[in-house]
């Protein structure tokens, strides 16, 4: 009998992304181009919604054609300066990284990120004390 449960030895990066409650690894990428994600600060509950592509297309020195390679998605924590400051302050393990949805095209990924930003009211949502609920709000 074989098990499909991932063991700690199969997880090759710190604070792994979770997708539907399970750790997401390179083996899970398949035909997906990218994903929409939520990062939650476990100390303050402040969140960030964004998107990331699994693949980077770069032209190596001396070459004419772009080559496809896996991006830095495992280490990625968003592009927001305020979020980056809090990562330094609290440490990466104080943040939960969740994949909201997976997409097979760049266009689907971009569309779903925008849709999530609107349905979650990231520009206007605030906590009871008036603090923005999302890092995206600034």
Listing of model-derived features with the role each one plays in the protein:
Residues 2-138:
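Structure-specific nucleic-acid interaction/processing domains
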């Amino acid at each position: 009998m074989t098990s499909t449960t991932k063991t700690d030895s199969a997880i090759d990066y710190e604070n792994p992304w979770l997708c539907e409650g399970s750790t997401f690894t390179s083996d899970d990428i398949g035909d997906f181009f990218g994903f929409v994600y939520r990062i939650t600060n476990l100390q303050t509950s402040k969140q960030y919604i964004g998107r990331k592509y699994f693949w980077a297309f770069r032209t190596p020195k001396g070459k004419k054609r772009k080559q496809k390679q896996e991006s830095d998605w495992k280490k990625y924590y968003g592009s927001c300066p305020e979020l980056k400051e809090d990562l330094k302050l609290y440490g990466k393990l104080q943040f939960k990284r969740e994949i909201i949805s997976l997409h097979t095209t760049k266009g689907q990924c971009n569309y779903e990120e925008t849709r999530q930003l609107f349905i979650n009211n990231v520009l206007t949502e605030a906590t009871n004390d008036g603090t923005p609920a999302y890092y995206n709000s600034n």
